[in-house]
Each structure stands twice: as C-alpha cells, then as structure tokens.
Amino acid sequence: MRVLPLALLVGLLAVSDAKVLGKCEFARLLETRYNLSRNDIKNWVCIAEFESSFNTAATNRNRNRSTDYGIFQINNKYWCGSDYGKNVCGIPCSDLMSDDITAALRCAETVRRATERYRGRGKGYTAWVAYNSKCKKRDLDQYMAECWSRGSNSIFPF
C-alpha cells in the first residue's frame, strides 16, 4: 500500500517538470532567444503544435517500440541516446524534455539538415509526420497571423 502513494508522488513530480507553451509564446521564444528567421519559426511552431501540443515533456511510444521525446517529438531510434538507437544528436533523450529547449532545437536542426542531405534541399521538415500531414500544405503565414503583426518581421503584436 505504501508503494501507491510514492508512485503517485513521482508521477506528479514528473508532470510538474513539463512546460506547455502557448503558440505565440513559443514563436516569441524562437525569435528572441534563438534568432530564427520567420520562415523557420512558422515551420517549427506548426510542427511543435501538432507533434506535442507545445509540451516540452511530451513522450510517445511508437509501434516499432521506439519513443519520441520533447516538444519536437524526436525519435530515439536514430537521434538521441538510449539503448535502442544511434544517438546522432549526441545527447541523452531526457535532454529533449527540458523546459530549456536549446538541446531540443539543436537536435531538431540536426534532424532537418540530415533529412535535407538525404531527401534534397527544402525537404528537411518532412522528417516530421505532423509537418507532412498538418503543415506542408497549410498557409503558415495565415496560421501565424495571430502572433505576427502585419507588415512587420516581428512577432510582437504592437
């Protein structure tokens, strides 16, 4: 019986580490902290929304027994360190679930560049299922309109 309360406490602590960002908050972070271009921001925002709902601690177990981690849902079969995969990004998968998204963004860029080398220039985001099904054919400027002011390259609505 004492195991159940301990398990609940551990579960609550794990959940409390998660940070769920808002769409415009995430876009602002990508612009101000990481100095990304508007084109990159709109793609990463769309991917993050449909992969993780902007949850930095999201995980998803796949049919092939691999797991996707973090706000960009990066897979452990190739990209992050686990007993399962190749760890191309050179980081433990747990780093992808931090509230500080630096490691997740760096690894996501590694995935994008590697995919472009394999599939061709401009095809890097196709590594994400969400990009192919939700973002690729969407008007991403319209999608981001609530975050960006008109006629400006800034995402600040003033």
UniProtKB/Swiss-Prot annotation:
Up-regulation conditions: (Microbial infection) Expression is up-regulated in response to heat-killed V.alginolyticus injection in kidney, hepatopancreas and muscle, with the strongest up-regulation in hemolymph, gill, gonad and lymphoid organ. After M.luteus challenge there is an increase in expression level at 2 (11.3-fold) and 6 hours (18.3-fold) postinjection, with the maximum level at 8 hours (25.4-fold), and then lowering down to the original level at 16 hours postinjection.
Q: Which domain of life is it from?
A: Eukaryota
Which cysteines in this chain are paired by disulphide bridges?
C24-C147, C46-C135, C80-C93, C89-C107
Q: Where are the transmembrane segments?
A: none
* Main localization of the protein described in the UniProt heading: secreted
Annotated C-type lysozyme domain ranges read 19-150
Active site positions, chain numbering: E51, D68
List where in the cell it is found: Secreted
Keywords, in A-Z order: Antimicrobial, Bacteriolytic enzyme, Disulfide bond, Glycosidase, Hydrolase, Secreted, Signal
Tissue expression, as annotated, is: Strongly expressed in gill and gonad, and marginally detectable in hemolymph and lymphoid organ. Not expressed in kidney, hepatopancreas or tail muscle.
Q: Show the catalytic activity.
A: Hydrolysis of (1->4)-beta-linkages between N-acetylmuramic acid and N-acetyl-D-glucosamine residues in a peptidoglycan and between N-acetyl-D-glucosamine residues in chitodextrins
Q: Which SUPFAM superfamilies match?
A: Lysozyme-like
What are this entry's molecular-function GO terms? lysozyme activity
Q: Which Pfam families match?
A: Lys
Q: What is its EC number?
A: 3.2.1.17
Q: Which GO terms describe its biological process?
A: defense response to Gram-negative bacterium; defense response to Gram-positive bacterium; killing of cells of another organism
Which terms in the GO cellular component ontology are assigned? extracellular region
| Presence of keyword Disulfide bond | yes
Please list which residues make up the signal peptide. 1-18
| The family this protein is said to belong to | Belongs to the glycosyl hydrolase 22 family.
What PANTHER family does UniProt report for this protein, alphabetically? LYSOZYME C
What function does this protein fulfil?
A: Lysozymes have primarily a bacteriolytic function; those in tissues and body fluids are associated with the monocyte-macrophage system and enhance the activity of immunoagents. Has bacteriolytic activity against Gram-positive bacterium M.luteus, and Gram-negative shrimp pathogenic bacteria V.alginolyticus, V.parahaemolyticus and V.vulnificus. May play a role in host defense.
- Additional comments on file? Lysozyme C is capable of both hydrolysis and transglycosylation; it also shows a slight esterase activity. It acts rapidly on both peptide-substituted and unsubstituted peptidoglycan, and slowly on chitin oligosaccharides.
Quaternary state and interactors:
Monomer.
Q: What is this protein called?
A: Lysozyme C
Q: Which organism is it from?
A: Penaeus merguiensis
